[in-house]
């Protein structure tokens, strides 16, 4: 197999890690249907991307999964998607999982959302909020809940206009399910 496919790749997954009916799991994931050698964004493959293009897929879910390919497995088939920002394979190995609600994830992967957290902190500071409480919250398991509550503030979105904040607001029901375990009204 080509060295191009050695190393670590990534996939953004939903909370339940099901995409187009395929249920992903830790470890080996094998495509059930026939593999599509040609086409773009088509069925017949398990899609993944590299670190350079990861930011293009942040709206696809709430987890980033590390992906490796079983290069010594004779069953493995891989193609680069014609779009240039993703790949398709019939076998993916799922490794570590990182939450997109954790600011450290964005720092680790050098993703644009790190600017969002900076803007949120600037917004909190400029509005005479208890900055220390928010800073502590960003470091705790309850940080996502507080971030969610701040993101609901229309003025934060209007002043900063971050695309990711807008996405989170537009999809607040799914964010609430992840953060609270149920939809909030």
Predicted feature locations:
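Conserved NAD+-utilizing ADP-ribose enzyme module
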Residues: 1-6, 42-44, 55-64, 68-185
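ADP-ribose/NAD+-binding catalytic cleft of ART/PARP-like enzymes
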Residues: 1-43, 59
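A helicase ATPase "motif cassette" and its flanking acidic/Ser/Thr-rich regulatory loops
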Residues: 50
């Amino acid at each position: 197999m080509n060295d191009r496919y050695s190393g670590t790749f990534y996939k953004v997954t939903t909370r339940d890690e099901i995409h187009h009916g395929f249920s992903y799991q830790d470890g080996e994931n094998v495509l059930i249907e026939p593999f599509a050698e040609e086409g773009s964004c088509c069925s017949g493959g398990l899609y993944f991307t590299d670190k350079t293009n990861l930011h293009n897929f942040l709206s696809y879910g709430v987890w980033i999964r590390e992906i490796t390919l079983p290069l010594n497995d004779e069953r493995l088939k891989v193609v680069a998607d014609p779009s240039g920002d993703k790949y398709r394979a019939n076998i993916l190995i799922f490794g570590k999982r990182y939450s997109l609600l954790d600011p450290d994830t964005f720092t680790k992967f050098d993703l644009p959302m790190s600017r969002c957290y900076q803007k949120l902190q600037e917004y909190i500071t400029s509005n005479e909020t208890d900055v220390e409480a928010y800073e502590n919250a960003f470091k705790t398991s309850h940080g996502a809940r507080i971030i969610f509550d701040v993101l609901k503030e229309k003025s934060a979105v209007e002043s900063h206009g971050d695309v990711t904040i807008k996405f989170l607001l537009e999809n607040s029901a799914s964010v609430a399910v992840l953060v609270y375990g149920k939809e909030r009204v």
